[in-house]
């Protein structure tokens, strides 16, 4: 069955969890092969529509990155957004729209993605500037982290001082402070009791 999928769709199958054949939790069971097939069909509908991710973001009322995540099976489609996606990409089948709403997304990634030059350079930039960004976040917000759950990401471009096109990536994540773990505040029963 994998041999029938396009190479790009096969790359979407996560390799970090080789024994994971499907995932279920109050949702329709979805095999990873089925998800890869759905992603291929949805991306084909996008290509046929000639819409960009920016166009889709405007139609759906989401960021361009989130629009891409929806199509790549990395975010769950809500019923409200499904109606907008149906209007924007009428070639997406009812079955695929239903599956995008009823299946939980695979938010993992194939380790091979880090070999893709753009992805690797973004990873390199985060690791290169990571310690400095952490120091500034701690200085401005305190001891904690930026959430990647309550998080928005948007990608755009600007023009540099020499007229060159420049990439602008905005990360907008909720600050989550670390807490002092006081026993009296812990509502869970201690495993030591």
Curated annotation (Swiss-Prot):
SUPFAM superfamilies: Cyanase C-terminal domain (SSF55234), lambda repressor-like DNA-binding domains (SSF47413). One of its GO terms (molecular function) is cyanate hydratase activity. The active site is at 121, 124, 147. Its EC number is 4.2.1.104. Keywords: Lyase. It is an enzyme of class 4 (lyase). Signal peptide: none annotated. One of its GO terms (biological process) is cyanate metabolic process. The keyword Lyase applies. It catalyses: cyanate + hydrogencarbonate + 3 H(+) = NH4(+) + 2 CO2. Catalyzes the reaction of cyanate with bicarbonate to produce ammonia and carbon dioxide. Belongs to the cyanase family. PANTHER family: CYANATE HYDRATASE. This is Cyanate hydratase. The gene is CYN.
